[in-house]
């Protein structure tokens, strides 16, 4: 439809007419938030962040601090009714050094039961999380660069992999206030509604834990 075609525009749902009308008049966009990064424009579909704010569950999530947890290496993992067993070829279990360090901290300092999850190389396209933490899927992300939408870009396409994330910001040049802003934007975006928990770690300590 073209904005100049009045009859065609009237056939659109009201909410889209309002958006187009606002754009044509130079007004503010009502449903989308345009974000520009490195000369590339994309739409995050951000909702009103004043209405959608994550809960701070840091105290609750870390109440087991000082209690000894456990680290387990799972030798199999089930997805959609199919069990994939570690064979060293198609299914492997090779956690990185940083994944091991974070697991040791979560179990040793915060009493968590941390399970390393095998990686499925074949069949292709099978996404698995890095961990099961107290039975919940978690993926580890180490932030080392900058960008207005750094966190959004890291998690927006991980719906099938995990709804929960750990962000290690030890080597991230962004300020903690900017990281917090980006996390709140992720919770506000209509494209990342699958996000549940986000754990922020720095220098081996949990800084903040968010929940939807």
Sequence positions of predicted segments:
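Glycine-rich, aromatic-bearing surface loops/beta-hairpins
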Residues: 203-212
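Low-complexity, glycine/serine/proline-rich disordered segments
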Residues: 1-95, 104-105, 113
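A short acidic/basic microdomain associated with nuclease active sites
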Residues: 109-123, 129-130
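Catalytic cores of nucleic-acid endonucleases
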Residues: 142-198
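Conserved beta-strand termini and adjacent loop/short-helix elements that scaffold enzyme active sites
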Residues: 117-119, 141, 201-203
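Conserved catalytic cores of phosphodiester-cleaving nucleases, focusing on short active-site segments
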Residues: 34, 131-142
């Amino acid at each position: 439809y073209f904005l100049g075609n009045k009859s065609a525009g009237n056939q659109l749902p009201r909410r889209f007419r309002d958006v187009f009308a606002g754009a044509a008049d130079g007004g503010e966009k009502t449903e989308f938030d345009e974000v520009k990064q490195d000369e590339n424009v994309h739409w995050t579909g951000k909702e009103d962040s004043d209405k959608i704010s994550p809960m701070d569950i840091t105290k609750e999530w870390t109440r087991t601090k000082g209690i000894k947890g456990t680290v387990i290496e799972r030798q199999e993992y089930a997805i959609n009714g199919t069990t994939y067993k570690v064979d060293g070829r198609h299914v492997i279990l090779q956690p990185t050094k940083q994944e091991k360090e974070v697991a040791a901290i979560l179990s040793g300092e915060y009493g968590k039961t941390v399970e390393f999850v095998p990686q499925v190389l074949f069949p292709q396209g099978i996404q698995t999380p890095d961990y099961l933490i107290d039975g919940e899927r978690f993926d580890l992300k180490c932030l080392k660069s900058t960008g207005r939408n750094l966190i959004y870009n890291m998690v927006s396409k991980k719906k099938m992999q995990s709804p929960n994330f750990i962000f290690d910001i030890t080597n991230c040049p962004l300020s903690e206030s900017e990281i917090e802003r980006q996390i709140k934007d992720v919770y506000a975006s209509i494209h990342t509604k699958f996000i549940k928990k986000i754990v922020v770690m720095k220098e081996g300590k949990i800084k903040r834990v968010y929940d939807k």
